[in-house]
Structure formats: structure tokens, C-alpha cells
Amino acid sequence: MCFTNKGRAFVTVVYDLPTSENRTAKGLPVQNFFNIDKDNGEVITALLPIAEFNAEEYFLMATKKGLVKKTSLSAYVSFVKRMNSSSITAVNLQEDDELIGVEISSGDDDVFLFADNGYAQHFCEYYKKKVTDDSETDDATDNNEESSDEEGSIDRHAGSGVRPSSRSSGCIRGIKLRGDAHVVSLMVVAPSQIEKGQCLIASANGFGKRLALADIPMRNRGGQGVIVMKNLERNGAVIGAVIGEENADYMLITNQGQLIRSSMSETHLISRYSAGNILMRMNEGDAVQALQSIPEDVVKSSKEVAEARQKEKEELAALEAAQKAKDAEAEAIKAYAAPQRGESVETVENTTENTDNQ
């Protein structure tokens, strides 16, 4: 399924997408598969492969203004059965708001929202059904539950997370943003992954840091969050955050088209109070536009392919070297045999050639 910044959802089957073994292949325009309104600034913000539309799993969505919403995957079954290029509304957005991310959740996962002002909000999505939940009041203005940003223990199953709602409903507040700040990244993490989990945060001026997820304290939904990136005067605004597996890679892409790929392990794991380190040196007037993670299994597969190709090259080089050595040995034998018989090397070669022809 494909989600756009305008809150629309599209669906297609994977076997309809073009395949290529060439990493430099351009592929086909996304408009060939989905009716994206490019002229109106519509872009894809999430692309999720789904095998089954399980009623116990959810699409958890986040918007630029810090609002969140979750809807059961089963609510999209009828839409998927139609399987055409038309779209449906996945979320009703407020004016000037955009959908920035969609993830699949279990209903009891941890949610992280990262804002461009260096703040991050961590809360549990678990929601305990109440008697009044039969009415559809999913607009953010009707759900301004404020949370405390004070340090302290939070019960993840207190039930004040994100209530499942219908496709036609609005959103509720996930993080209370300061000034003109906006959310740039959404992460959904299983509780079992929090203790050892890490994330990578990047800023517009090429700085970043790797941070333990456990260092971002859990709060109730709707709070202002905590600082995860300081010194924005030097670093620039936060442009994104991704899961930072130890053996994974990441890519940074700039406005001027520069791209680097590096290993997560090469970025120091530091505290959330630290300002961060240089990830990429920028040209004057350039800025980091996007951060993309490359999962550990993809990195491993890429390394295996690269190693296999290198082995093939080495084996081919060894065969060529062996053939050259064999040819050189044959030439040496001819050169040695000619004087012994009182013949020139050319005569020996001609005699050998005539013998071969006969």
C-alpha cells in the first residue's frame, strides 16, 4: 500500500511492479501505477508491503502538525479487493497539515515522534476501551489530552494511548509542538526492542548522532517531548530519524544531489544531551534533505553478492594468469629447443604448425 502526504491511500500488487537486476535501472514513474496529483504537490510518504490484512494489526499514522491516528488493517479489505488505480482517504487532515509517515503496529508498540526543533516524544500506543468509545470523536480538537513532561515512571498499559478509529475519522494529538516546529519522522518499535534499540538522527547541516532508544523516556501521549538534538544553530534543523541497527547502513541525500552511504556503527553512540558529530561535509548552500536506513539483512545480502562477485573476479584473474604462465612456458621451451637443433625459433614454430595441420 502507498500513502501520500495528502492523506490518500493507493494499493497495487507487487508482481505488477517492474523488476530489474541492474541497480542503475531507472524504473517507471509512480504515476504509471497511482494517480498521484503531482501538480498539487502530492508525494508518496510511505510504501508498505502487506501480505495479510490482519484485524489485530494497525496502520499508525503521523502528521506534520504532531497528530496521530491508527486504523485496523481490516478496514482496508474492501478497498484492496477493488484493486484499481483509484484512491481512498486514509486520514482527514487539517488545513496546512500533511501525512509524514505510516507504520504497521501491533496495538501495543512504542511510538516515537521526532520534530525538527530537536524534540522527540515517546509514548505507548496501547488504548484501553472506555464506555464512551462508541461515539466517533476523533478530531484532534476533541482529544487534547495533556500529558505531564515531568520525569517519572509511566504505566505503558494505563490505556491513554491511541484509540483505533475508522478511515473517515480525524486525528488526535501525539506531540505538543512549540512555535512553528513540525514532525519529521515517525518510528514504531516493539517493546522488546527498546532496551537494546538505537536510532540515528540527522540534521540539515550534515550533523547527526546515534542514540539509545532507552534514553528517550516514555511520556503520556500529547506531551512536548524531550530534547534529543541540541545546538541547532550549528547543526541545522533535524531532518529525520531512523532505526539504527548496529550492522545496518544509512544514506544521506542533499538538495544538490549528493549522496553518501555509511555504516551505522561508524557513528558514535552518545547521549541525548550531546550535540552530535559530523556525518557528511556539506558544500556551501547545500543541505541534507533526506535520511534513509538500509536494514541489516539488506546490507548482509549486498556484502554477500559483492564478495561473490569479487571471488569470481579473483578466480578469473587466476585463470588468466595461469594461461599466461602456460603460454610463457611454451614459448620458453620453443626458444630453448631451436638452438639445440640448429634451427631458428621461427623454423621450430613453422614445423610445429605443419605437424599440427597434418
Model-derived features: where do they sit?
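Short, structured "edge-of-domain" segments at secondary-structure transitions
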Residues: 1-358
